[in-house]
């Protein structure tokens, strides 16, 4: 694909600065770095590097499952204001922080949901309601599919940033893909400029409804992946 245009890699300076200082100075701080430049590279640019590959038309609904401190949902919302974003997390203190953060950044069309992913996936207000699901959760693709794909409409997609073992994970997730109604449509290498960060962006299209029994309870999902 053509190289991403510069606007994908830079926020408005004041917004980026405010977001960086809020995250580094809060209880939700990014613990692997307090250097603002490194934070921007490893987290903000890392998150929005997927945008050129998502083929967004404007106004899509997106859910960030296990959003934590707001990654990748908040940077994606800043970079693409037309997105209607839902941030889901199991810890209320994270959502309290995100409520303050999104208000201070004057972000509209952002909904915060306090829920575990497996419970949210069974909630009719959330189940199969989204055009796009994103997650930075560190989980095997088979596990991530069961957590995330129930939120996605048929015809929508899951965007998963994976490491160098992405192809192996896809091979191991064939059963999960068939069960929850997904199809891998692309595996795209992504390198973050001026860093040694490299990812494999795995795009999964939702081609069939997810059977109602999925997602299962968390213990079963992790202990006995599909």
Regions found by a protein language model. Name each.
Residues 4, 13-19, 23-29:
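Short, small-residue-biased leader/transition segments that mark boundaries at the very start
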Residues 26-58, 100-110:
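Class I SAM-dependent transferase core
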Residues 58-66:
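Conserved class I S-adenosyl-L-methionine
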Residues 69-81:
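Conserved SAM-binding loop of SAM-dependent methyltransferases across substrates and taxa
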Residues 84-89:
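Conserved SAM-binding motif I beta-strand of class I
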Residues 90-226:
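S-adenosylmethionine
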